[in-house]
Amino acid sequence: MAKGLLIVNLGSPVSPETKDVRRYLREFLSDQNVITMPKALWQPILRGFILPFRSWRSATFYKHEWTQAGSPLIAYTQVTRDRLRERLPDWDVQMAMNYGGEYPIGETLQTMAARGDAPIVVIPLFPEYTQSTTKTILDKVAASGVKTVVIDRFYDHSDYQKILAQQIDDAYEAGAYDTVILSYHGIPTAMVRHGDPYQQECETTTAGVKQYLKKVPQTKVEMCYQSKFGPVPWLKPYLRNRLMELAALGKRNVLVATPSFVADCLETLEENNVQNYQTFRANGGKNFATVRPMNGCEPFCDFLAKLAEDKIAAEANHGKA
């Protein structure tokens, strides 16, 4: 009997072809943890307007970023899994995806349980908790019927914040930047009003990272939100708008880090490296650079392995109490 570890990320289409992107978007945007509008109202909009137009456009973006290893998000999650296996040789380390058909959460957990894995630690690869990512993963974990131990967030761990700070310091040292932006995936403000802790946790992440920065003056650091979808208000400031404002203010050299993304994906590779870069340059900006996500880097894998080991130790001590 081995201890089990399951890391879970968002997911990806199985290919960058429009039909597969459409299938992926239909699954993702039908999740009521993501889109809270009543199904009777939302599904006609989704199927009649959004999927016909957004699928081919998103497929174009996926084709830009697709690699020989496939989706960057899945490829980097595989790197993370493999490096965790090196660090935890006595564990059964697996990965799952919330959407997309590959690496389904429920089937993966049931296979691990059938092999006798116990206990099984589940780590959603989202540092900050929110309904639209972590909760929907935990719903599927619960639906599997497999007994698990869940680490549902890790934004406030000092070791994690130190890794982020080191990455930002290293990137900052390579260029003369006027502003360093920590950009998080946005969520609708209605979710926060209804009690979602995401905004507060993002702010705590930013404060913690600033505390550990050694080369970046804290006065140069600010935070934004990106990837807005739909007409309803989302958390502000919006990254795209802020980039235009900074360029207008003469802040022509900007470095962007994305703490809520632990692996490269469309939001980092296409939205930031292409679209936001172009927006910044078109409005008078000069130097736009990004800090790459963790992408299975050694310090992050060290952190995740220790997180899992500490969780098991804490559960064992709790059981003895």
Swiss-Prot record:
Pathway(s) it belongs to: Porphyrin-containing compound metabolism; protoheme biosynthesis
InterPro entries for this protein: Ferrochelatase (IPR001015), Ferrochelatase_AS (IPR019772), Ferrochelatase_C (IPR033644), Ferrochelatase_N (IPR033659)
Subcellular location, record wording: Cytoplasm
GO biological process: heme biosynthetic process
Coiled coil stretches, renumbered: none
Gene: cpfC
Keyword Cytoplasm on entry: yes
Purpose of the protein: Involved in coproporphyrin-dependent heme b biosynthesis. Catalyzes the insertion of ferrous iron into coproporphyrin III to form Fe-coproporphyrin III.
Main location as per UniProt: cytoplasm
Catalytic reaction annotation: Fe-coproporphyrin III + 2 H(+) = coproporphyrin III + Fe(2+)
EC id: 4.99.1.9
Gene3D superfamilies linked: 3.40.50.1400
Class in the EC hierarchy, top level: lyase
Sites where the protein binds Fe(2+): 185, 267
Alphabetical list of Pfam families matching this protein: Ferrochelatase
HAMAP family: Ferrochelatase
Similarity comment: family membership: Belongs to the ferrochelatase family.
GO molecular function: ferrochelatase activity; metal ion binding
TM segment ranges: none
One GO CC term, this protein: cytoplasm
Protein name (Swiss-Prot/TrEMBL): Coproporphyrin III ferrochelatase
Keyword tags: Cytoplasm, Heme biosynthesis, Iron, Lyase, Metal-binding, Porphyrin biosynthesis
